[in-house]
A protein has these predicted regions:
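Conserved N-terminal beta1-alpha1 strand-loop-helix module at the mouth
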Residues: 3-77, 83-84
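Hydrophobic faces of well-ordered beta-strands that scaffold small-molecule active sites
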Residues: 23-27, 57-59, 88-90, 118-119, ...
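Active-site beta-loop-alpha junctions enriched in small/polar residues
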Residues: 28-32, 62-64, 93-97, 122, ...
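A general structural detector for well-ordered alpha-helical segments in enzyme core domains, enriched
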Residues: 42-46, 74-78, 104, 108, ...
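Catalytic PLP-binding core of fold-type I/II PLP enzymes
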Residues: 76-96
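Conserved anion-binding
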Residues: 98-110, 116-176
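Conserved small/polar residues in nucleotide/adenosyl-binding loops
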Residues: 177-183
Length: 187
């Protein structure tokens, strides 16, 4: 699918070099705010004030979805106005069957125009393929997360003493050596 002038990893590396920082600024507006219409100005202020230091911005789509259609409109209106040299990682943590993932990938990379997305690989690596068809885009796979519940699955020990998150890390390059266009990273 469409080419781009600078890949996600190149854009991120340039930004880290320019700022001397690996700061990723989360954009997580609370849906319970009394004045929904104050959220766009608040987000723009956060972006403006942190842009000189930010290596990336990371809006969490769940917060926008929780506000309904208006929340998605806020996100869709914000993204084109963000600094073009600062990569945007959409924190979506999606993991679904391929056909559904195809539409998530389209929505995030084509409609919203984000540079990268977070995904859950636990339904199998074939569920990632729709995202991997976008040249130069980034994909962050959840491998071992910081929440206490990560012990329930991600940190479980497998036969042979390895942990689930290690399996995720090992399988990514092996599974996708034929796909060199996007960048796959682990979180």
């Amino acid at each position: 699918m469409g080419g781009m002038s600078q890949s996600f990893t190149d854009k991120l590396a340039a930004r880290i070099k320019e700022t001397g920082s690996a700061l990723c600024v989360g954009l997580d507006p609370r849906p319970g705010m009394d004045d929904l219409e104050a959220i766009p100005a608040l987000l723009r202020k956060v972006v403006e004030e942190t842009a000189p230091y930010a290596a990336a911005f990371k809006p969490n789509i769940a917060y926008f979805e929780a506000m309904g259609l208006r929340g998605l409109e806020i996100l869709e209106d914000l993204l084109p106005d963000m600094p073009k040299d600062v990569p945007v990682v959409l924190d979506a943590k999606r993991g679904d069957i391929g056909e559904t993932q195809k539409y998530y990938a389209h929505a995030y990379f084509e409609r919203l125009g984000v540079d990268a997305v977070t995904l859950s690989p636990f339904m199998g690596y074939d569920t990632l393929e729709p995202f991997l068809n976008y040249e130069g885009k980034g994909v962050y796979l959840l491998a071992v997360t910081s929440n206490p519940g990560s012990a329930d699955v991600e940190r479980q020990e497998l036969a042979g003493g390895r942990r689930v998150f290690e399996l995720v890390g090992d399988m990514v390059p092996v599974s996708y050596t034929h796909l060199t266009l996007p960048t796959i990273l682990l979180v």
